[in-house]
């Protein structure tokens, strides 16, 4: 990864993904300060299209995928951001069902790496969320469907002003971050509204 700081170096997909996974050392940091600063440095890409924001304990990924498919069938150009990936990183970011190209992952990783210097240390999820928001803007999507990663109120995806929100079923999950009762967890997830 040190090579990425050498003049003339062009990041490859494999080095980009390796860099991204090293960001997991930052763990989970709930809060919007880093994500807000990062999107400002990117020029607020999330304001270039409409968003549908989906939170919940179970079924949010399926709900997001179905919503994206319905919007695409209606003739919209649709971005879809989900997590986690099952096989490869690029599954997380799609436009009209097509995974983000490897070359774009490398370009955006390099771009974000430069924008984070010297004072931002985003988590893996913040970084990939910013990458998705920028890719959707650059791809000219009409609408982006965003699946919340954890909770909602302080999730990295909550830098958008959605045209609509959905909250799927609520159950006890991530209690160390969201609270120990269904009402407290529902409060956190409803934070996207």
Task: Report each predicted region and the residues it spans.
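Charged, amphipathic alpha-helical linker segments immediately N-terminal to NTP-binding catalytic cores
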Residues: 11-26
């Amino acid at each position: 990864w040190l090579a990425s700081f050498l003049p003339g170096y062009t990041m490859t997909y494999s080095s980009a993904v390796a860099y991204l996974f090293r960001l997991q050392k930052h763990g989970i940091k709930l809060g919007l300060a880093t994500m807000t600063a990062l999107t400002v440095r990117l020029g607020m890409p999330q304001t270039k299209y409409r968003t549908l924001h989906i939170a919940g304990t179970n079924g949010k990924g399926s709900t997001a995928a179905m919503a994206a498919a319905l919007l695409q069938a209606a003739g919209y150009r649709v971005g879809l951001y989900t997590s986690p990936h099952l096989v490869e990183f690029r599954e997380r970011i799609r436009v009209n069902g097509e995974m983000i190209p490897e070359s774009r992952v490398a370009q955006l990783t390099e771009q974000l790496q430069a924008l984070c210097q010297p004072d931002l240390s985003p988590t893996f999820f913040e970084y990939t969320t910013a990458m998705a928001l920028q890719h959707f803007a650059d791809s000219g999507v009409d609408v982006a469907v965003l699946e919340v990663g954890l909770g909602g109120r302080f999730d990295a995806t909550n830098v958008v002003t959605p045209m609509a929100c959905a909250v799927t079923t609520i159950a006890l999950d991530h209690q160390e971050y969201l609270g120990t009762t269904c009402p407290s967890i529902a409060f956190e997830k409803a934070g996207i509204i």
